[in-house]
Amino acid sequence: INWLKLGKAVIDAL
């Protein structure tokens, strides 16, 4: 799992 991409996706969803 790519945590940086996942984190960016979460931030973009906010």
Swiss-Prot record:
PTM-bearing positions, type Leucine amide: 14
Record's keyword terms, sorted: Amidation, G-protein coupled receptor impairing toxin, Mast cell degranulation, Membrane, Secreted, Target cell membrane, Target membrane, Toxin
Tree of life domain: Eukaryota
GO MF annotations in UniProt: toxin activity
Main location: secreted
GO cellular component annotations of the record: extracellular region; membrane; other organism cell membrane
Keyword Membrane: yes
Subcellular location: Secreted; Target cell membrane
Pfam families linked to this entry: Mastoparan_2 (PF08251)
Expressing tissues: Expressed by the venom gland.
Record-stated family: Belongs to the MCD family. Mastoparan subfamily.
Function: Mast cell degranulating peptide. Activates G proteins (Gi component), which in turn activates the cascade of molecular events cAMP-regulated, resulting in mast cell degranulation.
Protein name per UniProt: Protopolybia-mastoparan-III
Protein's organism: Protopolybia exigua (Neotropical social wasp)
Lineage: Eukaryota, Metazoa, Ecdysozoa, Arthropoda, Hexapoda
